[in-house]
């Protein structure tokens, strides 16, 4: 195995978290569809797909590194929220937890002198900065006096 067992275990746990995030964002897209917020529906669908791609990236890395891969069950996701702001706030909270997980993994990789694993994690750490910034900005704007229909112009298109 080309990476530490400790990091491999954490990455396997992260696979579940990435698939979980994909489910959560898909549920949020369903919620937005019910509100006829097509821009937000598309935004959350893209977020869902992106999280799935993150999980697959980890699966491929573990496989190529000769580490065991486990795919655990992912619980269902909510499709109802009190407001669009609630959905975006929960997204930001979740992305912050994911960022914490990747920082912990980077620390474990360093402690085990796992340079390969540490290098792999750098992309995810950069990605998390972007994700947190997007959701923090969206949350801040939604906390203003915008109603959901005015907010329809907010979600990034790509």
Please report, for each region that a protein language model flagged, where it lies by residue.
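Iron-associated oxidoreductase/ferritin-like identity signal
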Residues: 1-158
């Amino acid at each position: 195995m080309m990476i530490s067992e400790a990091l491999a275990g954490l990455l396997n746990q992260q696979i579940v978290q990435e698939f979980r995030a994909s489910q959560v964002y898909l549920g949020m897209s369903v919620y937005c569809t019910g509100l006829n917020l097509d821009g937000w529906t598309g935004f959350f669908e893209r977020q869902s797909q992106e999280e799935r791609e993150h999980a697959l990236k980890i699966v491929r890395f573990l496989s190529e590194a000769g580490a065991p891969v486990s795919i655990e069950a992912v619980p269902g996701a909510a499709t109802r929220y009190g407001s669009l702001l609630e959905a975006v706030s929960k997204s930001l909270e979740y992305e912050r937890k994911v960022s914490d997980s990747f920082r912990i993994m980077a620390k474990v990789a360093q402690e085990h002198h796992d340079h390969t694993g540490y290098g792999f994690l750098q992309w995810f750490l950069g990605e998390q900065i972007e994700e947190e910034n997007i959701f923090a900005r969206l949350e801040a704007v939604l906390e203003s006096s915008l109603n959901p229909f005015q907010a329809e112009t907010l979600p990034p298109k790509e």
